[in-house]
Design a protein with these regions (language model features):
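Surface-exposed amphipathic alpha-helical tracts and adjacent flexible/coil segments at the periphery
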Residues: 3-349
Length: 349
């Protein structure tokens, strides 16, 4: 009915399986769009009113305050904690993030037209890294050689993750879909504390991944949760270095509370952020060449016709008529200077 009234594309709910999606695609001419990456809602799509009731912000209007990321207890009618003594975390309503890189070919084969990446309230570097990886993956499949470089998997994990799941795409995962121990970015494990320097607030870290100056770290301490720091200085064998490779040890400054054998997670990757920064901003903006035809005839409005490389056009005219100049007549240089004032748009004359 919607298609008969002009709807061209439908966005499917996240609760559908690939089999469901394929069935829908094969029974409609409407373009189908699906979510392929990012945050998941613990409720059926459109059915959660928690944010509206708790925070006065409607999730159905794109303003969800994510109360599902808060800690909760599961109690019986007598107030008894039903999960006491189990391995369940306290973030009982917090799902992992959706990641479909490994099953993307199945979605393409199912007939999906558009692939939706959840990025509400995310930083631009997140958008850049995730779109970069999925664009490359889709292009490789269409070229007949599907391949996702290991670096793309690592970049997506590093930029933001609550651990990953394919949600309902392949199966009904139950509790394994939940990130009940951590509701926000968990980062990537880069090493362990192997030595503490008493009285110096320094530690030696045995690295499992490359570490660079500017990286943000979290120590998952045995007592007190997590403490963080930024790597502003690190040494190897007494010499200052700007980066260090997996398998080596570095000495860095640490916050209070760090213990031996604590795991070290990187939550901010300075090199990855610099890479992502190349995808946006003025230097990275796509430039579209346009031709301009300016026409001025006495007694008529001055008109401007713009045409880009793909043949798209834009037309405008003044609300005054052209008159004979009293002092300085317009010449080509003056007209070009004015037309070339395209500001921060992506167009260039």
């Amino acid at each position: 009915l919607c298609a008969e009234n002009g709807m061209e594309r439908a966005v499917l709910a996240r609760e559908l399986s690939i089999k469901d999606i394929k069935t829908i695609c094969s029974n409609t001419d409407t373009e189908i769009e699906v979510f392929i990456h990012g945050a998941l809602c613990v409720c059926y799509s459109g059915q959660c009113l928690m944010s509206s009731l708790i925070g006065g912000r409607s999730g159905n209007r794109g303003r969800c305050a994510q109360p599902c990321r808060l800690p909760y207890k599961l109690t019986d009618k007598n107030g008894r904690d039903m999960l006491a003594g189990t391995d369940a975390g306290q973030y009982l309503l917090s799902p992992k993030d959706l990641n479909t890189l490994e099953i993307l070919p199945q979605l393409i084969d199912a007939g999906v037209t558009s692939y939706k990446i959840e990025g509400r309230m995310k930083r631009p570097e997140y958008v850049a890294v995730v779109v970069d990886a999925y664009r490359r993956a889709i292009d490789s499949y269409l070229a007949g050689n599907y391949n996702v470089p290991q670096q793309d998997f690592e970049n997506i994990e590093q930029i933001f993750n609550r651990d990953f799941t394919t949600a309902y795409m392949v199966s009904r995962p139950g509790r394994t879909m939940m990130s009940d121990r951590r509701p926000n970015n968990r980062g990537v494990m880069v090493g362990r504390v192997v030595k503490l320097f008493k009285g110096e607030n320094k530690a030696a870290i045995k690295l499992e991944k490359k570490l660079s100056l500017g990286d943000g770290l979290e120590f998952w301490v045995k007592v007190g949760g997590r403490v963080g720091t930024t790597v502003n200085k690190m040494t190897q064998n007494g010499q200052e270095v700007t980066s260090a490779l997996p398998g080596t040890q570095v000495v860095i400054d640490i916050p209070n509370g760090v213990r031996m054998n604590d795991r070290v997670f990187r939550t901010f990757d300075a090199e990855l952020m610099a890479y992502a920064g190349k995808f946006y901003g003025e230097k990275a903006k796509r430039r579209i060449t346009v031709d301009a035809v300016v026409t001025a005839k006495l007694g008529q409005p001055l008109t401007v016709l713009l045409t880009d490389d793909e043949g798209s056009t834009g037309f405008g005219e003044t609300n005054f008529i052209t008159e004979t100049a009293r002092k300085h007549a317009l010449d080509e240089a003056a007209v070009r200077k004015q037309v070339d004032r395209l500001g921060t748009t992506e167009y260039v004359l």
